[in-house]
Amino acid sequence: MSAPMSASTSVVTRFAPSPTGFLHVGNLRTALFNFLIAKKAGGEFILRLDDTDPERSTQAFADAIQEDMEWLGLTWDRIERQSDRFDRYAAAADELRAKNRFYEAWETPTELDLKRKKQLNMHQPPVYDRAALALTDDQKEALRAERGQGVWRFKLDHQRIEWTDGILGDLSIDAASVSDPVLIRADGQVLYTIASVVDDTDMGVTHVVRGSDHVTNTATQIQIMEALGKSAPSFAHHSLLTGPQGEALSKRLGTLALRDLREAGMEPMALLSHMARIGSSQPVELAGSVEELAEGFDLNHFGSAPTKFDVEDLWPLTASVLHGTAFEDVAGEIAALGVPADIAPAFWEVARANIGKRAEIADWWALFRDGATPLVADEDREFVAQAFAMLPDLPYDETTWSNWTSAVKEATGRKGKGLFMPLRKAVTGRERGPEMADVMRLMQVKPTL
């Protein structure tokens, strides 16, 4: 039985993506939970690339996974590749054969499908019938000659498999209701189920957190570990993400790749803060660092219900990150835009409260540097032209706006919103934004129509 999770300096967790595609928000949830558990316990976090599929695994995807993790600040203590460990998987397979827990089977997919349909028609669970165990040596040789190598299945003990899950609580699965899992394909490819078992036990992994779609996998893997004379780690299974209305998220995951969110302007801490709390009893709050996130992280706050995810919830958090960012943290970016050093701090104070994404910093500097395209309603055109004719030449300071609007008010009789809004829109090309006194003192060109 798997023990419940507890904090310990010997905690070892892992995130084990397959380099067959880009990471998406569903992957991130698993990665983040395992990272935070290790971080909080002062333990070890392993990035393990499950690259046993040579046809689909690529170095480009492996690199992309690491780039996404680095962008988010989810640093790993060591990296492992399953493609470097085939000798260990072969040794484990040999050990299972020696213990009569591994057997070869030759059914075709069509034959297996027919068996499943017959079982369902008879109201029986669609479980592999272990027909291969009844084959004689001569029959095996004949099948091998006809069909080549078969698949290798692990022979489950037909008893209940029980463990205390870190999120779902006490679980019990009847092994008789589960098919003996295929661990090695006919082409020799080692599958996830055994590779993960060997890696987790060899690497001393103490805590495994993954999606609830792995619960049956966990049951079979516990038996495989026991057959190999190993102890099972603590398991926890988090709920799966759905769309905002509870719809399946799987079809949308391609548009929720981490690299796409990064390119769209998402701030890492906004994404991490959201993903660390949704689906829990704790409110989503913007954290200042991964250390702060780890300190407040506890699997006991999570439940089994599907977790709704809406990417739109991330943008207010991203804006909050930027609003709270100190000048020192963006000084290099601002200097690269060409903002003069003497006004750079003042520019950031004005810009940061009025941006939702980092890319918008450049938009504000373009406005101050080059001027805006005026936004003028037809009924205000004559008024704005008169006001602009009264605008003094550069340089401007914090009194320019009040002095100018006072003069315009006296000359035109306009006041309040009818005075200020048309001038704001004409100077900035926007209906909303910073205090106009701050805008004017940062202008590098005289506004014109």
From Swiss-Prot:
InterPro entries: aa-tRNA-synth_I_cd-bd, aa-tRNA-synth_I_codon-bd_sub2, aa-tRNA-synth_I_CS, aa_tRNA-synth_I_cd-bd_sf, Glu-tRNA-ligase_bac/mito, Glu/Gln-tRNA-synth, Glu/Gln-tRNA-synth_Ib_cat-dom, GluQ/Sye
Assigned EC number: 6.1.1.17
Binding-site list for ATP: K251
Motif ('KMSKS' region): 248-252
Catalyses which reaction(s): tRNA(Glu) + L-glutamate + ATP = L-glutamyl-tRNA(Glu) + AMP + diphosphate
GO biological process per UniProt: glutamyl-tRNA aminoacylation
Main location: cytoplasm
Localization per Swiss-Prot or TrEMBL: Cytoplasm
PANTHER family: GLUTAMATE--TRNA LIGASE, GLUTAMATE--TRNA LIGASE, MITOCHONDRIAL-RELATED
Protein task: Catalyzes the attachment of glutamate to tRNA(Glu) in a two-step reaction: glutamate is first activated by ATP to form Glu-AMP and then transferred to the acceptor end of tRNA(Glu).
Motif ('HIGH' region): 17-27
MF (Gene Ontology): ATP binding; glutamate-tRNA ligase activity; tRNA binding
NCBIfam families to which the protein is assigned, alphabetical: gltX_bact
Subunit structure: Monomer.
Protein name as annotated: Glutamate--tRNA ligase 2
One Gene Ontology cellular component annotation held by this UniProt entry: cytoplasm
Key words of the record: Aminoacyl-tRNA synthetase, ATP-binding, Cytoplasm, Ligase, Nucleotide-binding, Protein biosynthesis
Pfam families reported in the protein's UniProt record: Anticodon_2, tRNA-synt_1c
Family designation: Belongs to the class-I aminoacyl-tRNA synthetase family. Glutamate--tRNA ligase type 1 subfamily.
